[in-house]
Amino acid sequence: ALIAYIQQEIETREQYKSSVITEAVTRGLYPSVPMKESGIDWLGEIPMLWETKRIAAFYQLRNEKVSDKDFPPLSVTKQGVLPQLETVAKTDDGDNRKLVRKGDFAINSRSDRRGSCGISDYDGSVSLINIVLKPRDKANNKYYNWLFHTEQFADEFYKWGNGIVDDLWTTRWQNMKKIIIPVPPIEEQQQIADYLDKKCKEIEEIIADRQSQIETLESYKKSLIYEYVTGKKEVG
């Protein structure tokens, strides 16, 4: 029962984190500011001083094919863009991956990989199923990284996809670039990014602590069962 209770707390905090991100990137940090209709279904109301523009105003496609022998293989995951495990086999069929430069944003184009995206901290290569974007000078990459991680953006992104099977839709850049996104004043974009970096780190630390508690309890439970089964501890 205690493990189930802690698990429920973790889920509640995950939901809270998600709502904190969505609120900050779509409505800002100041609840008292006047709002206006954005005219965009997935956004709804936005602060009066914010604008809206297409993604293409802030990102351009990087579409250079390379080999993972020349550029270390990276994986685009829900946790961001990470070095691929050494156990994953290297390919032998030439330039069959996409180049990623440090600071690029990558997102998996397939709907069954929903939420897999992030800014790369590395130069490397990713599989062709990913869209790799180079931020333009006027893009605050960290703010948009938070925006692109929201459920609302994921819904909109995959809505622009094509496919026969619902859970295997693929969204191409020629459609993604048309998606309209919020544009807060540049200094506010930085404030939002900094706030979310700090706030989400705090939430994640609590979640990690609770997960550690579950592991400790599970381990204790297993050791008790082992002792009873082996007769080292008597019932009653």
Predicted regions and their residues:
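Sequence-specific dsDNA recognition surfaces
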Residues: 39, 56-102
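Hydrophobic beta-strand signal
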Residues: 106-107
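Short beta-strand/turn micro-motifs at beta-sheet edges
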Residues: 30-31, 118-119, 164-170
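Short, charged beta-turn/beta-strand-edge "cap" motif at the junction between a beta-strand
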Residues: 111-115
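Amphipathic alpha-helical coiled-coil/heptad-repeat segments
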Residues: 1-33, 183-236
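A short glycine-rich beta-alpha junction/loop motif
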Residues: 110, 124-131, 164-190
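Short, surface-exposed loop/turn microsegments at beta-strand edges and helix-strand junctions
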Residues: 69-78, 98-99, 117-128, 137-138
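Non-catalytic DNA-recognition/assembly elements of restriction-modification systems
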Residues: 37-66, 190, 213
